[in-house]
Amino acid sequence: MNRIKEISFSDAVAIVEPGVFTADLKSAVRAQKLFYPPDPASMKDCTIGGNVATNAGGPRCLKYGVTRNYVIGLEVVLANGEVLRTGGRVHKNKTGFDLIGLFVGSEGMLGVVTEISAAFASASTGARDVVGCVCDSGESCRSGASNFCGGVLALFTRNR
């Protein structure tokens, strides 16, 4: 149960078994300018199945979200032996109950995950640096905050 069954670069989806190491999946899609954002600290040692069981995140979760945000389909064996397939290859599936959200993070209490359909994000083209010169650090902070948080900042400073 540690195979990458399929990677479709055209629709940015992979079908994997739960024993696939997170680092292996990341490196398999890196060449196609895609990436799997959840990055637990134990990425080289943890598996996608473990990530699904615990809804793993990592430092990038603040920007990209956690495992739940990238699982679009599951095959789960329930306690009575019944096999449940939920979700699919569609990135945005909002019909019926969110069974994927129910299973991701349940730590195996609801069933055993045997197959995972994972979505990828587009890899960024790189970081950009910004250099500026300011005379008043307070003014530069206010200017930066208004550029990034414009309307929200106005709500907090309206009555000043």
What are these model-derived regions, one by one?
Residues 3-157:
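FAD-binding subdomain of flavoenzyme oxidoreductases
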